[in-house]
Amino acid sequence: MVLTDPIADYLTRIRNANMVRHESLVVPASKMKKDISEILKREGFIRDYEVIDDDKQGVIRIFLKYGKNNERVISGLKRISKPGLRSYVKSDAVPKVLNGLGIAIISTSEGVITDKEARAKNVGGEVLAYVW
């Protein structure tokens, strides 16, 4: 199956698994998805992830995180830059998500980083997604 937007598929799988409160989910692996998973883990949106290597592409198993009383940690995920309409920002226009409560995931020349890191490094790039 050919996907035109693998990042949107990745975010949708996380959103769907989160809505029905699954413990984990599996997505096809890529370097970009590994980088985004690392950011989500570091920022506390997911519990953990592991890369399972098979003879082909490999998969990433993501372990979702829930709070007390099984409440969701991820309230929302939104794809910003799409294949048909790319969204780039300069270093002085890096967006804040919900006044700092969420994160923007940005692909820069420094790699895939959060909006806070982009402001600290004074770099812009392609805004991939918002997570809150």
Swiss-Prot record:
GO terms for cellular component: ribonucleoprotein complex; ribosome. Disulfide bonds: none annotated. It comes from the Bacteria. Keywords: Ribonucleoprotein, Ribosomal protein, RNA-binding, rRNA-binding. GO terms for molecular function: rRNA binding; structural constituent of ribosome. GO terms for biological process: translation. InterPro entries: Ribosomal_uS8 (IPR000630), Ribosomal_uS8_CS (IPR047863), Ribosomal_uS8_sf (IPR035987). PANTHER family: 40S RIBOSOMAL PROTEIN S15A (PTHR11758). One of the primary rRNA binding proteins, it binds directly to 16S rRNA central domain where it helps coordinate assembly of the platform of the 30S subunit. Part of the 30S ribosomal subunit. Contacts proteins S5 and S12. Belongs to the universal ribosomal protein uS8 family. This is Small ribosomal subunit protein uS8. The gene is rpsH.
